[in-house]
Amino acid sequence: MNLILLGPPGVGKGTQAKLLIDRFGIPQISTGDILRAAVKELTPMGAKAKGYMDSGALVPDEVVIGIVEERLAQADCQKGFILDGFPRTVPQADALGQVLSGMGKSIDHVVSLSVDKGELLKRLTGRRACANCGAGYHVDFAPSKVAGVCDACSGQLVQREDDKEETILNRLAVYEAQTAPLIAYYQAAGLLRSVDGLGTVEGVQSGILAAIRA
C-alpha cells in the first residue's frame, strides 16, 4: 500500500504514521530525514543537495525528487510506503507521479488529517520544554506536577519560539496556502481520503483505516 499523509502542524501525523508502520510493515518516508541521510551518505543526489545546503540555498525540487526516488527504490519499499510531508506542492505531486510511474508504482490513497485551527493552537501553544534537561510537557494534556517546574530535574519549563502563537499562525497560513491546491489535485484524481483528526489516537487510526478500506 502506497500512502501519502497530509495534515497541518500539530494534527498528529507522526503518531498516526507510526501506527500505520506497525500495522502494515511499511516504512515512513520523511523528506527531511531522507535528505539528511542522503547528504550524510553522499548518494549521487545527496552530493548535489549538499552543494545547495552548504551555500545556504534551498534544495530545488528536482534534487528533492531525485532523493525521494533513491529512497523509494530501496528494498523495504517494495510492499509499500508512507510519504510524510511530501509532496507539498502540485508540481512536486506531478513529478512524484512521473517517478512512480517509471517504477511501475502509483499512489493508492492520500489521507488528509484535519483539525480546526483553535484545537491546533491549543495543542501547539501548550507545549513546554525543560530549559535544563529538555523533557517535554503540555499545560493541558501532560502537565508537570508543579506548574512551570520540570518533574525530573526541577528546571524551568519554557515555551519554544516555534510554539508561540504568532509563529504557529504563520506556519498554518503557509501550510494552507501550499496544501489547498494539493488537496484539490488529489481530490480530482479520486485519491483523497479526508479524516477528522480530532479524537483519541485510536479513534483517528480507526478513521484512517476505514477511509483507506472504503
Curated annotation (Swiss-Prot):
What does the record give as the reaction this protein catalyses? AMP + ATP = 2 ADP
Places the protein is found: Cytoplasm
- Would the keyword Cytoplasm be found if you checked this record's keyword annotation? yes
The segment annotated LID runs over 126-163
Q: Where does AMP bind?
A: 31, 36, 57-59, 85-88, 92, 160, 171
Region annotation NMP: where it falls in the sequence = 30-59
Q: Could you say which EC number(s) this protein's record lists?
A: 2.7.4.3
CC annotations in GO: cytoplasm
Where does this chain mainly localize? cytoplasm
Q: Tell me the enzyme class.
A: transferase
Keywords from UniProt, A to Z, are: ATP-binding, Cytoplasm, Kinase, Metal-binding, Nucleotide biosynthesis, Nucleotide-binding, Transferase, Zinc
Q: What is known of its domains?
A: Consists of three domains, a large central CORE domain and two small peripheral domains, NMPbind and LID, which undergo movements during catalysis. The LID domain closes over the site of phosphoryl transfer upon ATP binding. Assembling and dissambling the active center during each catalytic cycle provides an effective means to prevent ATP hydrolysis. Some bacteria have evolved a zinc-coordinating structure that stabilizes the LID domain.
- Name under which the protein is recorded: Adenylate kinase
